[in-house]
A protein has these predicted regions:
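N-terminal export signals and maturation junctions of secreted/periplasmic proteins
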Residues: 3, 62-100, 104
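Peptidoglycan-targeting cell-wall enzymes and recognition modules
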Residues: 77-90, 121-231
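Extracellular/periplasmic catalytic domains that process cell-envelope and extracellular macromolecules
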Residues: 108-112, 185-188, 223-224, 247-250
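Active-site-adjacent structural elements in enzyme catalytic domains
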Residues: 110-125
Length: 279
């Protein structure tokens, strides 16, 4: 959920009703923005006038981990696209987040959106997983993290201990502290494109006006898609996506997202599926 000045939908009206703004309309104008800022300041939130998942959840009296936005019909277009074409292929809750997220980070053409969703879908196991699974066996560690565990014997003390594994493999990089600091596990991969490392969490927080480094779980619970879009934009992936619909473009994007080409056939398959729907 992301609402800001200029938006016009039923979610805006519902929010206005909760805040006591009269008359409640569907337009998010200056009056609504001022009311949101005032409410945020009174409730210990960043008074930026933007209604993200945390603000929405507090206004609605819900758990911040499970915001339940209203999805108006028809779904808002992005770059001239009707996102309801994606129904049945992507969870409705994800589709509902696309308009504002895509507009914020210019993922607003058939190519860009299809490439973006293909990567998100693969990295998250079909939009089901929002945080990194580090429950590896010794054999798995020696295969995936060979730099840190050159042999199964070296990996055995860490096997099936996700916290120890993360603290080991993510220590002393990405602005994380030492293995003993616990930063590796605290800032492990979250979101649909696995935001990882203190530096990325801090930068993402600045981009949305929240202290995400102090509440990293918000990435998986509230900002799975938005964090992925921020990563996408930060790494210049719109420009790569503009290169076309060929497998070589998917490969180039995959290397930047994954650091390699793990799962490339699945990413290509999903890209073709989404592009066919959106083009």
């Amino acid at each position: 959920m992301l609402l800001k000045k200029g938006d016009n939908n039923e979610n805006v009206k519902l929010m206005q009703q909760k805040l006591g703004i009269e008359p409640a309309v569907t337009n998010f104008g200056p009056k609504t923005e001022a009311a949101v800022k005032e409410w945020q300041a009174k409730n210990g939130l960043t008074p930026d006038g933007i209604v993200g998942p945390s603000t929405w959840a507090k206004i609605m009296g819900e758990s911040a981990a499970a915001p339940t936005p209203i999805v108006s019909a028809p779904i808002a277009p992005v770059g001239g696209l009707k996102l309801d074409k994606l129904k049945g292929h992507i969870p409705d809750a994800v589709i509902a987040m696309i308009p504002d997220t895509a507009a914020k980070f210019q993922i607003n053409t058939p190519l860009r959106l299809a490439h973006f969703l293909a990567q998100c879908g693969h990295e998250s196991g079909g939009f089901r997983v929002t945080q990194e699974n580090l429950n590896y066996s010794a054999k798995g560690l020696a295969g995936i993290f060979k730099k840190y565990f050159p042999t199964e014997a070296a990996a055995t003390p860490y096997a099936r201990q996700p916290q120890k594994i993360a603290n080991k493999v993510y220590a002393n990089r990405m602005a994380n502290g030492s293995e003993a600091s616990g930063d590796g596990y605290k800032f492990r991969g979250r979101g649909y494109i696995q935001l990882t490392g203190r530096d990325n969490y801090t930068q993402f927080g600045k981009a949305i006006g929240e202290d995400i480094a102090s509440n990293p779980d918000a990435v998986s619970s509230n900002y799975a898609l938005l964090s992925a879009a921020w990563f996408w934009s930060k790494n210049g992936l719109n420009k790569l996506a503009d290169g076309g619909a060929g497998d070589t473009v998917v490969t180039s994007i995959t290397k930047r997202v994954n650091g390699g080409t793990i799962g490339l056939p699945d990413r290509i398959k999903h890209f073709k599926e989404y592009y066919h729907l959106l083009a």
